[in-house]
Amino acid sequence: MLPRLWWLVLWLQPLATLPASAVHDEEAAMSVPRCKSLKETDLIKTSVSDCYCYNQHSQIQWTYMWSTVQVTVTSPGLLNIVYITGSHNCQHTESILSFIKCVTHNFWAPEEAEEITIVFSPYGETVCFSVKPVGRLLPYIVSVSRNIVDFKLFLVFVTGIFLFLYAKTLSQSPVFYYSSGTVLGILMTLVFVLLMAKKHIPKYSTFGALMIGCWFASVYVLCQLMEDLKWLWYGNRMYILGYVVVVGLCSFAACYSHGPLADEGSRDLLMWTLRLFSLALVYTGVAAPQFAYAVLIVLLFSWSLHYLLRAFSYLRWKMRPWFTAEPQVARYLTDDEYREQAEAATARALEELRQACCRPDFPSWLAVSRLQAPKKFAEFVLGASHLSPEEVSTHEKQYGLGGAFLEEQLFSLQTDSLPAS
């Protein structure tokens, strides 16, 4: 049974912007009239703690589906970013998905750093933030740039499309099972260990709580390591390679001992997990939410179209006998029927020939000049038989009972039936 799609109501925002959220953004923007407006290609050098706002574009263009705006704040000293409005302020979010995205971003965003980069969509609500120094205020630089095509967004979008279209195939592939299990063991060891120990956890509620905790802990550790990846690679290259090799081999061995998914329920669970994950990737891989909704609707419709076509094919197969006549069975003629039809066809053709010869436009003299027996032809046109008594007698002797042709056929059959010496 297909699961219900009621969760789309909770996770997807409405296509139109909510009035309450728009009113809140306007009030927040009015409360900070002293904030400086940022534009693309701006480069601001200052030593005063101030706030800045980037006004989003109201007109959406499909050519900027994967474009992002990047604001970089650099200083010799430590800085802190405080969001005033925008999607990073989690007090007035429009949906559960927006709230989770906001909390996740604020949880993993660096609180204090010498260089802070803010990446957001050029469409949507106005983003306002203030720059707060940590300790003594030093000069800092605020630069604004726009990526026409953010390859990270495009890669996330393409990955989501691929996972959605090939979720069923991947869920049944042993290669995908082993490779994804190995990668999961390397990147998220806690989640991998919990999945391997699932049989020893009796309650699903306990397993779900542990899975959520392990998932967020693993993602948090992974994001923290990704920020310092260059430093870790240059200073601890051998340790990183050793960890990848050892944990990768252990993860592959655990997956190999467990074996690929055999029962249909586990495969369906993996397939639906991949599809839900792919929808989340498609939604986050597009800058404008309207384009994301359109792509999600097309994907869901294309997936449902397969089942509609199957139902239509089944109904057509069931209703086909009502509209299709039974095919006629061919029957061979007997010898008597064949002889009767041959005689009737011959008589009809001869009569048509007589009528054609009796027409005024028939070239009678030309026909007579080319015939060997003009008298016989004239008698035939006047109604006599087309065969003379001598011809009938010769035919009976040749093909009748006791004729030469019949005897030849009988002797040839007897010769073929004799065994070869």
Swiss-Prot record:
Q: Which residues form the signal peptide?
A: 1-22
Supply the name of the protein: Nuclear envelope integral membrane protein 2
Query: Could you say which protein family the record assigns here?
Result: Belongs to the NEMP family.
Q: Which UniProt keywords apply?
A: Membrane, Nucleus, Signal, Transmembrane, Transmembrane helix
* Species of origin: Mus musculus (Mouse)
Keyword field contains Transport: no
Q: Does the keyword Repressor apply?
A: no
**GO cellular component entries:** nuclear inner membrane
Which positions form S-S bridges? none
Subcellular location(s) of the protein? Nucleus inner membrane
Which sequence ranges are marked TM in the entry? 64-84, 147-167, 175-195, 206-226, 238-258, 281-301
Regarding the membrane, this protein is recorded as: Multi-pass membrane protein
Q: In which tissues is it expressed?
A: In the ovary, highly expressed in somatic cells.
Where primarily located? Answer: nucleus
